[in-house]
């Protein structure tokens, strides 16, 4: 606490703003009220706190929750007294948000109430797009299960806080759906390792792999790692900061202040922590899920089947292939198509494509998918065995296009938010998370020139990313990540590094 108080004074001096460490105003949600609304909106000085409050459903999002958050965020965007937004759960550390309430959607579909299903996804995806283009800082506490719709609430925010309780996944392949909520836009851009052609992004989308908070941080799925017990103090701290220049919470300068405030509460990774993916496993993912070389799921399966490498690599490839065989064949193909399209599109178009896909899968006019049936099997009937897929044929390109495209007979659009912008790259994500392999490659290649003999050492790479870039100076785990990249992707030539 003394360390944090001293840092507050340092930040006050650096940025020229005042902090209030004793007299902050806050309203706390009454979580013991049984009829409390599913989303709570409270005040923490100049911050606004949105608390998901549907614990019995692990905060699974329904239309009411998405709609209320969307409307309130629009009001916060216009408010002169709101500097930033904190998004968290009343159910932590068990869950942040376990996903969208697709069980209810499946019931709508069986009852032919497709308008209700489409409204559900319109509300949810409009919220995702709003968060992705929000002009004030949003800080998300991913303390607990963060899956599906929970990923949609967090992945688009520049400040994504993982904890020791985080369990991150996109498990939609198990219910015959697809990795939605803009995840196929986000993951190709922010994942740090084995992702030069969206390989790790595609792997996570197709396998539904669950990763811990520490792994989520190392992979770039989270921007910071903070112990769960420090989140309340962090919330108070965030409510104390205000932008110094023209009181503009949309300025890049204020985003930097938010980042430095979060950095004060960052926790070390667990002492026994070992990154989930060894170099051999990263090599498998990189080789077998390359978007530029794989046009179909069958290509990926063949790559896994024929993988040549170490014994560890071959075993991992076989493990992945076995896992993929339990997933919905049609969903795998749709997911691949969406990663291909959304990895090169802008955020608004990508989330609209998710909306078209969700609506078409709900209506299922051509009987190409098994979303409703598989969702009922797993989430309503609570069957523990995988759903017995019957739609196993390879879809034609025209069928995939039809599923992921709008229908003239079914007009739909995202709700209009206050930002009225879109972009192909997030403006702040790369500044505050660990660097990607592509960033490290660009630096090494820029510093290396065989004609002039210019070279760069591993030590210089580590120093550049850990000390030279202000927003990443001393960042947790940055040296470990750079070492992984240098060891796996570089070769030593004349006492320097060359990118392979």
From Swiss-Prot:
Entry keyword Repeat: no
Record's keyword terms, sorted: Branched-chain amino acid catabolism, Hydrolase, Mitochondrion, Phosphoprotein, Ribonucleoprotein, Ribosomal protein
Membrane-traversing stretches: none
EC number per UniProt: 3.1.2.4
Binding-site positions, substrate: 124, 149, 172, 180
Entry's localization field: Mitochondrion
One MF term in the entry's GO annotations: 3-hydroxyisobutyryl-CoA hydrolase activity
GO BP term (any one): valine catabolic process
Top-level taxon in the UniProt lineage: Eukaryota
Pfam families: ECH_2
Residue(s) carrying Phosphothreonine: 326
GO terms for cellular component: mitochondrial inner membrane; mitochondrial small ribosomal subunit; mitochondrion
Leftover remarks: Present with 3950 molecules/cell in log phase SD medium.
Subunit structure: Component of the mitochondrial small ribosomal subunit (mt-SSU). Mature yeast 74S mitochondrial ribosomes consist of a small (37S) and a large (54S) subunit. The 37S small subunit contains a 15S ribosomal RNA (15S mt-rRNA) and 34 different proteins. The 54S large subunit contains a 21S rRNA (21S mt-rRNA) and 46 different proteins. mS47 forms a protuberance of the yeast mitoribosome and retains a solvent-exposed cavity likely capable of accommodating a substrate, in accordance with it being an active enzyme as well as an integral constituent of the mitoribosome.
Family stated for the protein in its record: Belongs to the enoyl-CoA hydratase/isomerase family. Mitochondrion-specific ribosomal protein mS47 subfamily.
Job description of the protein: Component of the mitochondrial ribosome (mitoribosome), a dedicated translation machinery responsible for the synthesis of mitochondrial genome-encoded proteins, including at least some of the essential transmembrane subunits of the mitochondrial respiratory chain. The mitoribosomes are attached to the mitochondrial inner membrane and translation products are cotranslationally integrated into the membrane. mS47 has enzymatic activity in vitro, and is able to catalyze the specific hydrolysis of 3-hydroxyisobutyryl-CoA (HIBYL-CoA).
Protein name, UniProt field: Small ribosomal subunit protein mS47
Organism field: Saccharomyces cerevisiae (strain ATCC 204508 / S288c)
Source species taxonomy: Eukaryota, Fungi, Dikarya, Ascomycota, Saccharomycotina
């Amino acid at each position: 606490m003394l360390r944090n108080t001293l840092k507050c004074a340092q930040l006050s001096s650096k940025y020229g703003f005042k902090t209030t460490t004793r007299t902050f105003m806050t309203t706390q949600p009454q979580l013991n009220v049984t009829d409390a609304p599913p989303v709570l909106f409270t005040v923490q000085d100049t911050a606004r706190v949105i608390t998901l409050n549907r614990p019995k459903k692990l905060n699974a999002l329904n239309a009411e929750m998405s709609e209320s958050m969307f409307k309130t965020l629009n009001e916060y965007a216009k408010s002169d007294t709101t500097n930033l937004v904190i998004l968290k759960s009343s159910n932590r550390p068990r869950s942040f948000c376990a996903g969208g309430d697709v069980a209810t959607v499946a019931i709508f579909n069986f009852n032919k109430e497709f308008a209700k299903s489409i409204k559900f996804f319109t509300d949810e995806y409009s919220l995702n797009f709003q968060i992705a283009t929000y002009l004030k800082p949003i800080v998300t506490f991913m303390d607990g299960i963060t899956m599906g719709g929970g990923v949609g609430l967090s992945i688009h925010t520049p400040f994504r806080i993982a904890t020791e309780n985080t369990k991150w996944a996109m498990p939609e392949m198990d219910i015959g759906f697809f990795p939605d909520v803009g995840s196929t836009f986000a993951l190709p851009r922010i994942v740090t390792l084995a992702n030069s052609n969206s390989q790790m992004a595609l792997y996570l989308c197709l396998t539904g792999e669950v990763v811990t908070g520490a792994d989520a941080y190392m992979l770039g799925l989270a921007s910071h790692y903070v112990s769960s017990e420090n989140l309340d103090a962090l919330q108070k701290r965030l409510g104390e900061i205000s932008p110094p220049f023209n009181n503009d919470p949309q300025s890049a300068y204020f985003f930097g202040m938010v980042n430095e405030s979060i950095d004060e509460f960052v926790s070390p990774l667990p002492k026994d922590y070992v990154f989930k993916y060894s170099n051999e496993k990263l090599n498998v993912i990189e080789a077998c899920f390359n978007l530029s070389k794989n046009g179909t799921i069958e290509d990926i399966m063949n790559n896994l089947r024929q993988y040549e490498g170490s014994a560890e690599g071959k075993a991992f490839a076989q493990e992945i292939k076995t896992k993929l065989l339990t997933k919905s064949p049609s969903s795998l193909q749709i997911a691949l198509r969406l990663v291909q399209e959304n990895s090169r599109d802008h955020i608004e178009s990508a989330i609209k494509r998710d909306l078209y896909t969700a609506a078409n899968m709900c209506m299922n006019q051509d009987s190409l998918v098994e979303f409703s049936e598989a969702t009922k099997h797993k989430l309503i009937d609570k069957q523990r065995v995988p759903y017995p897929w019957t739609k196993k044929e390879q879809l034609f390109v025209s069928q995939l296009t039809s599923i992921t495209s709008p229908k003239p007979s079914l007009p739909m659009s995202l709700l209009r938010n206050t930002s009225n912008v879109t972009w192909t790259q997030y403006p702040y994500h790369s500044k505050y998370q660990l660097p990607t392999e592509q960033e490290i490659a660009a630096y090494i290649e820029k510093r290396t020139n065989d004609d002039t003999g210019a070279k760069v050492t591993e030590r210089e790479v580590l120093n550049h990313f850990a000390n030279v870039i202000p927003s990443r100076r001393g960042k947790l785990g940055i040296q470990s990540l750079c070492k992984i990249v240098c060891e796996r992707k570089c070769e030593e030539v004349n006492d320097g590094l060359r990118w392979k």
